[in-house]
Amino acid sequence: MSELLSFALFLASVLIYAWKAGRNTWWFAATLTVLGLFVVLNITLFASDYFTGDGINDAVLYTLTNSLTGAGVSKYILPGIGIVLGLAAVFGALGWILRRRRHHPHHFGYSLLALLLALGSVDASPAFRQITELVKSQSRDGDPDFAAYYKEPSKTIPDPKLNLVYIYGESLERTYFDNEAFPDLTPELGALKNEGLDFSHTQQLPGTDYTIAGMVASQCGIPLFAPFEGNASASVSSFFPQNICLGDILKNSGYQNYFVQGANLRFAGKDVFLKSHGFDHLYGSEELKSVVADPHYRNDWGFYDDTVLDEAWKKFEELSRSGQRFSLFTLTVDTHHPDGFISRTCNRKKYDFDGKPNQSFSAVSCSQENIATFINKIKASPWFKDTVIVVSSDHLAMNNTAWKYLNKQDRNNLFFVIRGDKPQQETLAVKRNTMDNGATVLDILGGDNYLGLGRSSLSGQSMSEIFLNIKEKTLAWKPDIIRLWKFPKEMKEFTIDQQKNMIAFSGSHFRLPLLLRVSDKRVEPLPESEYSAPLRFQLADFAPRDNFVWVDRCYKMAQLWAPELALSTDWCVSQGQLGGQQIVQHVDKAIWKGKTAFKDTVIDMARYKGNVDTLKIVDNDIRYKADSFIFNVAGAPEEVKQFSGISRPESWGRWSNAQLGDEVKIEYKHPLPKKFDLVITAKAYGNNASRPIPVRVGNEEQTLVLGNEVTTTTLHFDNPTDADTLVIVPPEPVSTNEGNILGHSPRKLGIGMVEIKVVEREG
């Protein structure tokens, strides 16, 4: 209803101003600004819904000041461009409409009415309400009743008798199991769901709406609210260190806790969370690649579900035979948005909806088959009678190709339990949420029936039943939950451990690189993650007087304040204010100790603007002074005009990437020497090794042969035509995820370049 009211007020404002208000520059500017704000808010809501499926939430608030990089970003570029072009077109049209009667005399009453209606349209818009609520949640002090509802359970289960298998289905919400809405989509896993305890109304709350947040909610009974963006959790050294979570209780009760997934464990700090809470045995893409049957059978995130669940079955067999009490948690990935992935072993590879194939539905149908196969193996084993199997979604599906169809249904998370010791077949429609999952499992295993804010759905009352406004209540508790991190409020001294790549201050430890905003009573960490902007772009959003400490590779800050370190890949520390003084210190000891030293200086806005502009220079446009092209730092030598076909810098150098260009091209500002030696330090990838690689300058071509290890080769060139471009053509680029950023599309690698140097020859 508020959407209709908001739009009606907007339309009325436009019509009244355009036809009645007349000519007045000030009123025109004010009305256009407010109406433009309405448009921006609603486009933001539309775009946020596209990415999150949940409107403007915490993740969006963070992303408003940080770029979205990482998983599947290339698939969102076209919609993003469309939104920008649409916004420009709407603003242009709006300005044209408002000035239709600009030659008529100004009318104060109609101008005021139009402006008030415009303000009303903004106030009534759902986007404004969502943003207002989020901003309030950032500034609240908490809710006094948090302590009454947050309950820590006993640290042990008195007499544990059952092993636990807990399966997180990536985005595998219960809505997919509606056979009337989606016929025959999930027959195998749906049949198993109907044989167990099926909890049909598990809602999603703020702070539980992405994978690591869903895991924290289900195991600790609290939303993932942190003093930093949740997916950047990989940078912390401990995760809710004071909380008692399900893994802690299991370990204290004699369980060996295992976790198996196909993606990298470091993404979003899953490894940190699990190690902090009782898990000693973790297997992700790095740990599995030496044991799986086919290490090259991978999708953008890691190993396919059939591979992961095969390894989980092997681990279940091994642990069951040992007689040791255990829990085995696993997380699938094939149903990840925006499209999902199809494992090669499933029979259900294609699902049509609305008369055409749908990739997301197909991925769901395939993945549920793989999960069902895994469960049926356990059920057929002699160890099933001693096992509890839990299947849950980590969160509701985000915007995938099935999302618009899901939104037509009553959406809930998946949570069902199959008990080998005591088969129970029942659908329980009690109102609950993800935080109740851990407490319910704990209750079944013989422990307490509460865990944090979670309550057992078998013997307790969920917060979703107690509070009709549970979403608002959860946001009200946000400051209380953030305080559970015990995060420091000041930073005076700090220590950098180069071997561990960690920084420590005031009792907290973070992985490097790291940016910190330091104020009188707050230290805000801004880690670098797959979903966040590089730290220099985050620093560019700081206010002129904000105190910062930035620990990163020296070359990243050298272009601003320490040009002598432009080629150094060591750690450096920069601190100061963007509009004031900055210092850069080279970390030259294994254990390096520093102090914060912020001076209360006069702010220079010209200096501030210059710093911000420099920080925002994209990597390929950075230039440094050097007599060769050094590939393990960003940018290129000053002599280089532009380059293409080259991937991002890594610790050793850079790969060619045929996704960015079939050839490596380096164009220099001036013609290359008439005679010169080209000294290339490089290696080849895969089938490019031991094969002739053409290297061209103008009309002359030489051949380069590389192995899988780095070598240095000198080629002799004559350049009578004054050519200014060097071209290298890898013969057979290989599509691979090796060394790739998690969630990105595969790169096509050819050669790995460490250094290229042009040496002029006499004569």
Swiss-Prot record:
Keywords per UniProt: Cell inner membrane, Cell membrane, Membrane, Transferase, Transmembrane, Transmembrane helix
Topology of the protein relative to the lipid bilayer: Multi-pass membrane protein
Transmembrane segments: 4-19, 26-48, 76-98, 105-127
Enzyme class: transferase
Reaction catalysed by this enzyme: a phosphatidylglycerol + a membrane-derived-oligosaccharide D-glucose = a 1,2-diacyl-sn-glycerol + a membrane-derived-oligosaccharide 6-(glycerophospho)-D-glucose
EC number: 2.7.8.20
Function recorded in the entry: Transfers a phosphoglycerol residue from phosphatidylglycerol to the membrane-bound nascent glucan backbones.
Keyword Transferase set for record: yes
Protein name per Swiss-Prot or TrEMBL: Phosphoglycerol transferase I
BP GO annotations: glucan biosynthetic process
CDD domains the UniProt entry points to: LTA_synthase
